[in-house]
């Protein structure tokens, strides 16, 4: 028995993961959540259908705010069909919303990639597309990761205007290097457009990170990776995240991008609501067959993806349900792990109608057992059995 269910409905809402409860859905919304006592007393109308979750956990659907691809489909295909296929695949892994993430690329390719996502929005048959994450091109050439130096651009507001025009208001978040010349002006401009700015692929000093915070660069892309290291004489970008409680950060919980001990240490230093689980997965993640090519590079898989030419980490092979499972294996509670996968990204990306199992929130849920097997994923009230085929009851 989940002891919280006997303490009244308020305690149910405070939990990220629930059992011994009932969730009432109507159309696209959550109408009510019942503990056992209220459920037993409730007289439901005859048209209410009941689905027995057989003791599994019910949690808010996962929100992946940094994902390049999955199942052989990715943003580097420059195709709305690939984005729509990602939408169909992702419920298998508990994802109900995602933000397709674009690499730096020459201008015309970036515009093509942006238009592909825009064309897919509203036509999804699975996970919802929240918008677009631009991971460049205003990033540091000294912290590229596997991005191409030829694809970078000096800070250019006119170029940003072209991106904004192509995106038709759908750019949600953007990774930038705070130390770049003219970044202050660009940051203020982007903030005025409602874009969440993230420090990433950056060689910023601690002081430059603080300057970035002053213009609302308050989120961080894949913490520890592709950014200036923490040193006792210069805390760098990583140190700034640890020192300033207002800074939030993405975490790739595959055990490779960040040592699990550092994730536990981070939890002792940061408020939990500032930590966001992401996959940063490549199109080669769960790819059924064929050569492993991502963003034009041949990659190989060894727990995560590495570029074959120089063995540089290229991205993760993680899914969100695997990330949640890993966080629990690292020592986090299930509630903490799910909050990092749902409520926290919803809050930081300003999507307050997502990320909680409570009345008025979108009917986006994931149902999984103690072994992290997904039984159902529910997107806007549509039920996917084992996250795959939409089903009716």
Language model: regions and residue ranges:
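His/Asp/Glu-enriched, well-ordered alpha-helical/loop segment
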Residues: 236-249, 255, 267-279, 284-361, ...
């Amino acid at each position: 028995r989940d002891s919280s269910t006997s303490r009244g409905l308020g305690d149910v809402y405070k939990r990220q993961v629930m059992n011994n409860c009932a969730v009432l859905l109507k159309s696209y919304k959550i109408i009510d959540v019942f503990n056992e006592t209220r459920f037993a007393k409730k007289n439901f109308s005859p048209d209410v259908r009941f689905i027995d979750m057989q003791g599994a956990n019910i949690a808010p659907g996962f929100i992946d705010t940094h994902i390049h691809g999955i199942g052989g489909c990715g943003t580097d295909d420059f195709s709305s069909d690939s984005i729509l296929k990602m939408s169909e695949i992702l419920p298998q892994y508990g994802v109900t919303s995602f933000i397709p993430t674009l690499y730096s690329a020459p201008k015309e390719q970036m515009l093509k990639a942006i238009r592909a996502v825009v064309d897919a929005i509203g036509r999804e048959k699975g996970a919802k597309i929240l918008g677009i994450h631009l991971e460049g091109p205003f990033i540091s050439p000294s912290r590229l990761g596997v991005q191409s130096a030829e694809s970078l651009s000096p800070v250019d507001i006119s170029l940003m205007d072209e991106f904004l025009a192509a995106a038709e208001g759908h750019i949600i978040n953007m990774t930038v290097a705070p130390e770049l010349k003219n970044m202050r002006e660009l940051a203020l401009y982007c903030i005025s457009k409602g874009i969440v700015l993230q420090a990433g692929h950056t060689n910023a000093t601690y002081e430059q990170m603080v300057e970035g915070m002053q213009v609302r660069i308050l989120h961080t892309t894949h913490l520890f990776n592709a950014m200036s290291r923490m040193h006792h004489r210069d805390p760098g970008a990583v140190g700034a995240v640890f020192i300033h409680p207002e800074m939030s950060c993405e975490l790739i919980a595959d055990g490779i991008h960040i040592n699990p001990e550092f994730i536990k240490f981070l939890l002792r230093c940061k408020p939990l609501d500032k930590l966001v689980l992401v996959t940063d997965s490549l199109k080669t993640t769960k790819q059924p067959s064929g050569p492993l090519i991502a963003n034009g590079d041949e990659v190989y898989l060894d727990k995560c993806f590495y570029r074959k030419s120089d063995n540089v980490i290229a991205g993760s092979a993680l899914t969100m349900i695997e990330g949640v499972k890993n966080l629990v294996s690292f020592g986090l509670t299930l509630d903490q792990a799910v909050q990092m996968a749902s409520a926290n990204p919803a809050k930081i990306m300003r999507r307050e109608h997502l990320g909680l199992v409570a009345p008025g929130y979108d009917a986006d849920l994931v149902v999984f057992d103690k072994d992290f097997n997904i039984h159902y994923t529910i997107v806007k009230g549509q039920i996917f059995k084992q996250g795959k085929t939409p089903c009716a009851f």
